[in-house]
Amino acid sequence: MGKTNDWLNFEQLADDKVREELKPPSMYKVILNNDDFTPMEFVIDVLQKFFSYDIERATQLMLTVHYQGKAICGVFTAEVAETKVAHVNKYARDNEHPLLCTLEKA
């Protein structure tokens, strides 16, 4: 019977150690930066296409980019943020716009 209790104690200690070692992933803000050349309609398109915002929210964020110089499009894990930044920047270049999407640690 002592062996069963030892096993249960070991499992509890192992579970506690794993919980201590688990950390939430680092999060990153994906940011759209203003420029003087990208049309507002294109920025709205980007916000809808890559961040799934409805037209009203996309318009609000586009105006934030326009008037404040930048806007946070969302906060994501590193891999998701990097992918979104790469896709947005490629889409902008493919459409011959200088729109710049960046990320920074949240």
Swiss-Prot record:
InterPro entries listed in its UniProt record: ClpS, ClpS_core, Ribosomal_bL12_C/ClpS-like
User: One biological process GO term for this chain?
Assistant: proteolysis
Lineage, top-rank taxon, reads Bacteria
Which cysteines form disulfides?
none
What Pfam families does the annotation carry? ClpS (PF02617)
Q: What does this protein do?
A: Involved in the modulation of the specificity of the ClpAP-mediated ATP-dependent protein degradation.
Whom does it interact with, and what assembly results? Binds to the N-terminal domain of the chaperone ClpA.
**Similarity annotation:** Belongs to the ClpS family.
Name of this chain's protein: ATP-dependent Clp protease adapter protein ClpS
Organism, by scientific name, is Erwinia tasmaniensis (strain DSM 17950 / CFBP 7177 / CIP 109463 / NCPPB 4357 / Et1/99)
